[in-house]
Swiss-Prot record:
This is Zinc import ATP-binding protein ZnuC. CDD domains: ABC_Metallic_Cations. The complex is composed of two ATP-binding proteins (ZnuC), two transmembrane proteins (ZnuB) and a solute-binding protein (ZnuA). Part of the ABC transporter complex ZnuABC involved in zinc import. Responsible for energy coupling to the transport system. ATP binds at G38, P39, N40, G41, A42, G43, K44, T45. GO terms for cellular component: plasma membrane. The keyword Membrane applies. Its EC number is 7.2.2.20. GO terms for biological process: response to zinc ion. Residues 6-221 form the ABC transporter domain.
Length: 261
């Protein structure tokens, strides 16, 4: 753990008397990709805010490597359509960035052709790459990517996942990625953490990229994708709380992959 870039210990967050996060244990090391998945309302955004230092947890602690450089890619960006803002001007909002640095970052993510385009005119996939380029301009040790493939088709998702992996390899940075997709995640993910206010389960995604049916479904992009099968031994009610007495009559029991309780 001494090599960790960031470490969360028993983190809990409460809003209006409701537990949004409870007893969260999480760490990210250099070169490690951790994918955080879970349904809407699971606390993923709250956890990201805690990681970024935008929110102080009510219980537990968040430790960061001293002077840690973080590159953050938001889930989406809304720009007023009447605002005259080119991609270059947007990237130059990062201190110390000139056209040369902006172009280099865009080339790294395969989006150099949009440098002079208005941000309102580029496609969703191009915007995701621009946001990723902006995160890279901070020369991050930790990349925090909030829904980096949102609004992108499966082929585009595979391309972005492959790009993120190459960036990790090139820069040696840790990656914390958030996803709403409960079953389809990066095959190069080192750890998948399933969150529903607490850590329901975590583990390595099963490598299914060689399965004929998977290859047929996703074609040449299959190696960049993987299915993660969840092994929960409990249920949640409509409010996200653990159901301690399911209909079967069995009590709530945590398995070996469950990181709480």
């Amino acid at each position: 753990m001494s090599n960790a870039l960031i470490r969360l210990e028993q983190v809990g967050v409460t809003f209006a008397g409701q537990n949004v996060l409870e007893n969260i244990q999480l760490s990210v090391e250099p070169g490690q990709i951790v994918t955080l998945i879970g349904p809407n309302g699971a606390g993923k955004t709250t956890l990201v805010r805690a990681v970024l230092g935008l929110l102080k947890p009510d219980t537990g602690s968040v430790w960061r490597k001293p002077k840690l450089r973080v590159g953050y890619m938001p889930q989406k960006l809304h720009v007023d359509p009447t605002l005259p803002l080119s991609v270059l001007r947007f990237l130059r909002l990062v201190p110390g960035v000139d056209r040369t640095r902006a172009l280099a970052a865009l080339k790294e993510v395969g989006a150099e052709q949009v440098i002079d385009s208005p941000v309102q005119s580029i496609s969703g996939g191009e915007m995701q790459r621009v946001l990723l380029a902006r995160a890279l301009l901070r020369e991050p040790e930790l990349l925090v990517l909030d829904e980096p493939v949102q609004g992108v088709d499966v082929a585009g998702q595979a391309e972005l996942y492959s790009l993120i992996t190459r960036l990790r390899d090139r820069h040696g940075c840790g990656v914390l990625m958030v996803s709403h997709d409960l079953h389809l995640v990066m095959s190069t993910t080192d750890q998948v953490v399933c969150l529903n206010r607490h850590v329901c389960c975590s583990g390595h995604p099963e490598q299914v990229s060689g399965d004929p049916a998977f290859v047929e479904l996703f074609g040449k992009n299959a190696p960049s994708l993987a299915i993660y099968h969840h092994h929960h031994d409990h249920a949640h009610d409509l409010h996200g709380s653990v159901v301690t007495q399911p209909a079967s009559g069995h009590a709530h029991v945590h398995g070996e992959n469950c990181k709480h309780g």
